[in-house]
């Protein structure tokens, strides 16, 4: 479990606790939260753990020693230690819950080691899909989505003819698939007027009406960048053209996504808005394990509604489509610029409406430098460049015309 102390990590370990006869934890990694990591070690007794912040390694080792467990785990520290955990020999599946592009290198380590990937870190494919997909083919690893929308698409696609589930991660468009319809809750501001967005606070933007998620992804949901990034991810996972991937605002978050077939038939996957279900399916596929979770009840829901996203209200959505169509290194630049802009918003250095402004400026500055056939080192280089560029532009205090 990469990112065991984050939102995806804690929910994954809850699943393991509920189904101890189905899963065993052998390796955990975290960024800085050594107290929670220590609790997880006490409960799950992995073979190895790693903390990214090496300054906390001594404290973590002391915590583990104080547990007094009979077979304590190997304790590692530093970024390279995270890669070691990702490729740990006794693991057969790696759940990637590290937020942002920081999860790219560990995910690549797991792929090269031949592990099956339950991908909750969408930035890995968005920034480096052109590198990740060939690596999956070479290693024979299988990638399954652990986020709700792409899990929904994956589940629906299994109803298509002549579709080999094991070849899911090849990025080849399945037989009979015409279009993908991604649903979006609309985020924290779906009922706000555009003119009111200038008054958005960090607290406003990190309060999601439907889902329990981390702060960064909750802000991405509010800007609809999360859905824009998922468009790019869907393109790489399922081979669908950007013109055939559509977004619909669905406030109830009951239909998690839909696929449209060549004969105009539509398949949808429904369920309560709970991240544990797609995580479990990515871990259990192709089996379905019995749970005691709340059963689905359509009459309790009452109604399902949909509407087209407002492009003025959600400029990040258009930026994501444009970056995806540019291809090459542009999606990596978009992703890095977004991560940095959201980080600066959370630190109250910029306003909510400035997030797409700085992303747009960064992408514009990269237009004449796009590498259409990047290697991994090229992806990492532009990722670093975009982060620095956003920081420098914010320091200048410049204001740009809103891309909306």
UniProtKB/Swiss-Prot annotation:
EC number assigned by the record: 1.1.1.267
Pathway: Isoprenoid biosynthesis; isopentenyl diphosphate biosynthesis via DXP pathway; isopentenyl diphosphate from 1-deoxy-D-xylulose 5-phosphate: step 1/6
Signal peptide bounds: none
Protein residues bound to 1-deoxy-D-xylulose 5-phosphate: 122, 148-149, 185, 208, 221, 226-227, 230
Pfam families: DXP_redisom_C (PF08436), DXP_reductoisom (PF02670), DXPR_C (PF13288)
Residues that hold Mn(2+) according to the record: 147, 149, 230
GO MF terms held by the record: 1-deoxy-D-xylulose-5-phosphate reductoisomerase activity; manganese ion binding; NADPH binding
Superkingdom of origin organism: Bacteria
Record: residues binding NADPH: 5-8, 31-33, 121, 123, 214
Keyword Methyltransferase: no
One example of a Gene Ontology biological process annotation: isopentenyl diphosphate biosynthetic process, methylerythritol 4-phosphate pathway involved in terpenoid biosynthetic process
Family of this protein: Belongs to the DXR family.
PANTHER family assigned: 1-DEOXY-D-XYLULOSE 5-PHOSPHATE REDUCTOISOMERASE, 1-DEOXY-D-XYLULOSE 5-PHOSPHATE REDUCTOISOMERASE, CHLOROPLASTIC
Function, as annotated: Catalyzes the NADPH-dependent rearrangement and reduction of 1-deoxy-D-xylulose-5-phosphate (DXP) to 2-C-methyl-D-erythritol 4-phosphate (MEP).
Name of the molecule in the record: 1-deoxy-D-xylulose 5-phosphate reductoisomerase
Organism expressing this protein natively: Prochlorococcus marinus subsp. pastoris (strain CCMP1986 / NIES-2087 / MED4)
């Amino acid at each position: 479990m990469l990112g065991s102390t984050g939102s995806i990590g804690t929910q994954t370990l809850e699943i393991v606790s509920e189904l101890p006869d189905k899963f065993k934890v052998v390796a955990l990694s975290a960024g800085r939260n050594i107290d929670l990591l220590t609790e997880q070690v006490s409960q799950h007794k992995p073979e190895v753990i790693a903390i990214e912040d090496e300054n906390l390694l001594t404290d973590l080792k002391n915590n583990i020693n104080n547990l007094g467990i009979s077979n304590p785990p190997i304790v590692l520290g530093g970024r390279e230690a995270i890669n070691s955990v990702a490729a740990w020999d006794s693991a057969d599946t790696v759940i990637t819950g590290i937020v942002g592009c920081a999860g790219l290198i560990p995910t690549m380590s797991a792929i090269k080691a031949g592990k099956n990937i339950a991908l909750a870190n969408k930035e890995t494919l968005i920034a480096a899909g052109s590198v990740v997909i060939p690596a999956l083919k070479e290693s024979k690893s299988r990638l399954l989505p652990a986020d709700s929308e792409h899990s929904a698409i994956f589940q629906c696609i299994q109803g298509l003819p002549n579709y080999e589930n094991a070849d899911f991660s090849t990025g080849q468009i399945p037989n009979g698939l015409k279009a993908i319809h991604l649903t979006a809750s609309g985020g924290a501001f779906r009922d706000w007027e555009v003119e009111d967005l200038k008054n958005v606070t960090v607290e406003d933007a990190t309060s999601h009406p439907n889902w329990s998620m981390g702060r960064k992804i909750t802000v991405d949901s509010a800007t609809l960048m999360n859905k824009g990034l998922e468009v790019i991810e869907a393109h790489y996972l399922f081979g669908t053209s950007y013109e055939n991937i559509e977004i619909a605002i669905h406030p109830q978050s009951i239909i998690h996504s839909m696929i449209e077939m060549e004969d105009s038939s539509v398949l949808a996957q429904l369920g309560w808005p709970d991240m544990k279900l797609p995580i479990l399916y990515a871990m259990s596929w192709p089996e379905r394990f019995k749970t005691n979770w709340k059963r689905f009840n359509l009459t309790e829901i009452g109604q399902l509604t949909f509407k087209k996203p407002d492009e003025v209200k959600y400029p990040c959505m258009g930026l994501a489509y444009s970056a995806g169509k540019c291809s090459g290194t542009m999606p990596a630049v978009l992703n890095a610029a977004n991560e940095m802009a959201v980080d600066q918003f959370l630190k109250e250095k910029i306003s909510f409406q400035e997030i797409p402004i700085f992303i747009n400026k960064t992408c514009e500055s990269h237009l004449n430098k796009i590498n259409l056939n990047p290697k991994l080192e090229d992806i990492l280089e532009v990722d670093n460049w975009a982060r620095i560029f956003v920081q420098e532009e914010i320091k200048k205090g410049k204001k740009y015309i809103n891309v909306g």
